[in-house]
Swiss-Prot record:
CDD domains: Dtyr_deacylase. This is D-aminoacyl-tRNA deacylase. GO terms for molecular function: D-tyrosyl-tRNA(Tyr) deacylase activity; Gly-tRNA(Ala) deacylase activity; Ser(Gly)-tRNA(Ala) hydrolase activity; tRNA binding. GO terms for cellular component: cytoplasm. It is found in: Cytoplasm. The lineage of its organism: Bacteria, Pseudomonadati, Pseudomonadota, Gammaproteobacteria, Vibrionales. Pfam families: Tyr_Deacylase. It is an enzyme of class 3 (hydrolase). Keywords: Cytoplasm, Hydrolase, RNA-binding, tRNA-binding.
Amino acid sequence: MIALIQRVSEAAVRVDGEVVGQIDKGLLVLLGVEKDDDEAKAKRLMERVTTYRVFEDSEGKMNLNVQQVDGKVLVVSQFTLPADTKKGTRAGFSRGAHPADAERLYDYFSDLCQQVLPTERGRFAADMKVSLINDGPVTFWLQV
């Protein structure tokens, strides 16, 4: 399971012109689910995402996590993250989970986040338009 996390001052996701998820200060989490992922991996990744220190303390060091700054999380499914890009000019998607499994684990991950801090989400498998103001920019790839 993969999370591409971005520190944002704001982010929103729209489907058919309607805002379905929106946050101010926090993390935009693009979540990719791989074939062998399960609830244990989702829980471990949620723990890493919500405790990963990406926000600056009073000395300007990235020592604070999203919970410590009263931030929020916006989780967006991203089936292209597990893609195989090693050869050629077109990505291969065989490493991604079956859509039903991916949706179940996406929902599970999002629900776990919601138990820890305010969480918004995109709409699984929808054609989404994601807008954000990346603060920094600060972006990390987390994988379990």
